[in-house]
Curated annotation (Swiss-Prot):
Subcellular location: Cytoplasm
Primary location recorded for the protein, binned into one broad class: cytoplasm
Domain of life: Bacteria
Protein's name in the database: Aspartate--tRNA ligase
GO BP terms in the entry: aspartyl-tRNA aminoacylation
Family: Belongs to the class-II aminoacyl-tRNA synthetase family. Type 1 subfamily.
Keyword DNA damage appears in the UniProt entry: no
Chemical reaction(s) catalysed: tRNA(Asp) + L-aspartate + ATP = L-aspartyl-tRNA(Asp) + AMP + diphosphate
Secretion signal span: none
The protein's Enzyme Commission number: 6.1.1.12
Gene: aspS
Species this chain originates from: Streptococcus pneumoniae (strain 70585)
Amino acid sequence: MKRSMYAGRVREEHIGQEITLKGWVGRRRDLGGLIFIDLRDREGIMQLVINPEKVSAEVMATAESLRSEFVIEVTGQVAAREQANDKLPTGAVELNVTALIVLNTAKTTPFEIKDGIEANDDTRLRYRYLDLRRPEMLENLKLRAKVTHSIRNYLDELEFIDVETPFLSKSTPEGARDYLVPSRVNKGHFYALPQSPQITKQLLMNAGFDRYYQIVKCFRDEDLRGDRQPEFTQVDLETSFLTEQEIQDITEGLIARVMKETKGIEVTLPFPRVKYDDAMALYGSDKPDTRFDMLLQDLTEVVKGVDFKVFSEAPAVKAIVVKGAADNYSRKDIDKMTEVAKQYGAKGLAWVKVVDGELNGPVAKFLTGIQEELTTALALEDKDLVLFVADTLEVANATLGALRGRIAKELGLIDNDKFNFLWVVDWPMFEWSEEEGRYMSAHHPFTLPQEETAHELEGDLAKVRAIAYDIVLNGYELGGGSLRINQKDLQERMFKALGFSAEEANDQFGFLLEAMDYGFPPHGGLAIGLDRFVMLLAGEENIREVIAFPKNNKATDPMTQAPSTVALKQLEELSLQVEEDETNKTN
């Protein structure tokens, strides 16, 4: 029979109606001769009642054979429940079954289909189709669908044009490693799966599309963590003739629309703006979490005269004050934080506690002469804990920024119901790579430099600033963008500053440089990480929880066993040969 409605949508207004439902058996309970079934579908759970006095012996026998995850079809009359279940939207009603058909049976599942399961991640991914039956996973993916629907409606209203760009593109330097695809037709040549549609969307501006968007898959072969996947989805935007402020206004409107339509939250516009240098100085991060205080304090000048060379001779001395936390952290706890500090390049972690108005701790004796000045500078009160890092400014900022976030989580200082958006602006154009031994683009080589610093492309690259902007939510980079270079000579200077010879630049980006000969308009854009955005809206800590079929931390799929080996014939067609791993040769 045709399904009347979803099981999770049956309500009191349906009492007395005969309906047909289809779904999965969640639980079966036998009580006093009656059989109760929790029928589950994507919209929720509905209680079924099979009464032996009201159904045939055949229906009763079928009901007695049901097990968890059997797929069934039932017909019956909706009735009011004697004892309502306030925990379920359908809790005021039940279905008195008159007909029952088993559409399919099921083996015992490797884990229970319920929220809060204890199965490990690889087991969940191995049986992802079962994991996705769980209500919280269904809700996460329904939320994702609502977000993309809201985004599309908003951008369509603003006359953005949805254009698909190629997945088989050219490998270019800069950024993370590419995923390469060998060409069978052009032997020895490779496509790259795009890390973003950056260049193609810029070319669409040159083509006159004016406003482009795409919700698009991107690919990066990089080390994974909780907010990264090898394939991910971004909301990609590009516009012509708009200023940095206008692009940010459009983005804020998009965020506000999504927040209202999916979470019922009215966000305050415009979002705060923080300069990159200020974000690093105050929060120790270029993606600051502003849901709590504990700002970094610069004490370099305050401690200059102390008889403690670690402080007095350090390039920078910075500190954070953990208010009222002196009793929360033992010496052993602080030793653990010291190990964290070393991971960020710090040589150690100094500390003092304020006890009865006096400084206590390993370095307190060196600070007695400046206690009053220190107390004033840090607004110290009894029971405060002060953590110091003496090192380069970069190391001090990064270390204390990491400790700031860690401590806030440990002490429960973060309001998880808050959504604090902000812009980080006025970025450096380049960042130094120790691994490469050279300056590299902080964003990408197509970012427009601020006019007043562009002359440093032939001078001190550390002084070049970019017209770039990142949007941050609760300590996560939600997205980033910039105005782009549209003048050929400036783009060539940028490539040269990055160490490209004219020949290398032409080989890698000749098509873009050529396009700049044909009236390339001023343009700029932005991309928002959809997976990360939905993760934060859903209150999850890993983007795997909002992706239908993600990879694990080894970039593999336990369900399909991808990546896998392929037949020798396929490799021969591609003129490829796999070298045996040296470790395998000795086994």
